[in-house]
Regions:
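A structural micro-motif
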Residues: 3-4, 57, 78
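Flexible loop/hinge segments that line or gate small-molecule binding clefts
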Residues: 65-74
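Hinge/cleft segment of the Venus flytrap/periplasmic-binding protein
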Residues: 84-127
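Hydrophobic alpha-helical
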Residues: 12-66
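Short beta-strand elements at the ligand-binding edges of bilobed clamshell
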Residues: 74-86
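Short beta-strand elements in bilobed, periplasmic/extracellular small-molecule ligand-binding domains
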Residues: 1-17
Length: 127
């Protein structure tokens, strides 16, 4: 689905072969792709394709995972959005505890910080 200059694709099969096949078709049809944003932690699989096919794109993804960091260190992944999962879990449990123990109202929306990692700052990040 293409909206103006944004092409949205949804790859349901997440094995490497399926991802590579889909991306190969997309890059063949759309030779002007400059930025790829993967909205889940499987950005390393897209990075594998980008690396092996020598595509010159900016690659953005999610999560401070070993395989993602390895591709970031190689310069394939440019940015990772990290969401502090331990802090998210802690906030959820505290909210539940306060509601059950003290009948405190549960906030429907609780904004959490995110961190943007680059090759230059990832070595100093504590998730």
């Amino acid at each position: 689905k293409k909206t103006d200059n944004i092409l949205k694709i949804d790859i349901r099969d997440t094995d490497l072969k399926s991802i590579e096949k889909c991306l190969n078709n997309i890059f063949t049809e759309h030779k002007d792709i400059r930025i790829v944003f993967v909205t889940n932690s499987r950005v390393s699989k897209v990075a594998h394709f980008i690396d092996s096919s020598k595509k010159d794109v900016i690659l953005i993804g999610y999560d401070f995972l070993k395989e993602n960091i390895e591709y970031m260190d190689k310069g394939i992944i440019d940015f990772l959005v990290c969401q502090k999962p331990k802090q998210q879990g802690y906030r959820g449990l505290i909210s539940l505890y306060q509601h059950l123990a003290f009948s405190s109202p549960v906030e429907k929306i609780y904004f959490m910080p995110i961190d943007i990692l680059t090759k230059e700052n990832s070595a100093f990040y504590r998730n």
